[in-house]
């Protein structure tokens, strides 16, 4: 794969300054955007630049990229050696019934046709929202802890030991699951049972 860090003149590391990355992208994107650049390969270069930016701004894809660039773990073997950490399995066991409860509530709500049936669901709505809020708080704490680990990895990255590369791979796996779970439990995606005023 091409080194996305090199496209922005950055050293390959687990942590990068998001503001500096954004500025570097804006500067380079303006120079190679097809609308302002007549060169025949401008569109391809802009697409490549955008893909590199998307890779680097997300800590999960950035870590995956670093693991691949290190050459320590061949790309085709990454999926085989990446197992789900035990702590995530335990956490998922707690998330699963909450998501099931949310799904059940949404089904009941969509089937409710009258203001009375909606009103009868308000207690269940509050219960589901409370459970989601508690779990969301835990997941955000786990995400913050993962960000701290990202900084720790960055401090030792130049060592490039196999153990360090493996830690990066495991952290990417954990953060990917956290991203997915946090997105799936967003409270603002839960419709209210309060009927709309006539």
Outline where the language-model segments fall.
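C-terminal accessory/regulatory regions appended to core domains
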Residues: 1-198
């Amino acid at each position: 794969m091409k080194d996305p860090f090199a496209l922005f003149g950055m050293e390959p590391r687990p942590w990068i300054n998001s503001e500096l990355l954004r500025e570097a992208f804006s500067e380079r994107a303006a120079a190679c955007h097809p609308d302002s650049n007549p060169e025949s390969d401008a569109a391809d270069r802009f697409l490549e630049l955008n893909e590199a930016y998307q890779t680097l701004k997300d800590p999960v894809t950035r870590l995956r990229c670093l693991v691949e660039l290190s050459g320590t773990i061949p790309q085709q073997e990454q999926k085989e050696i990446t197992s789900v950490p035990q702590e995530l399995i335990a956490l998922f066991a707690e998330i699963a019934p909450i998501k099931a409860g949310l799904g059940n509530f949404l089904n009941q709500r969509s089937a409710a046709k009258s203001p009375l049936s909606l009103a009868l669901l308000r207690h269940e709505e509050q219960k589901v929202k409370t459970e989601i809020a508690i779990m969301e708080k835990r997941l955000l704490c786990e995400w913050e802890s993962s960000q701290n680990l990202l900084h720790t990895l960055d401090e030792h990255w130049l060592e490039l030991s196999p153990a360090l590369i493996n830690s990066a791979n495991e952290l990417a796996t954990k953060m990917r699951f956290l991203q997915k779970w946090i997105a799936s439990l967003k409270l603002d995606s839960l419709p209210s049972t309060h009927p709309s005023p006539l």
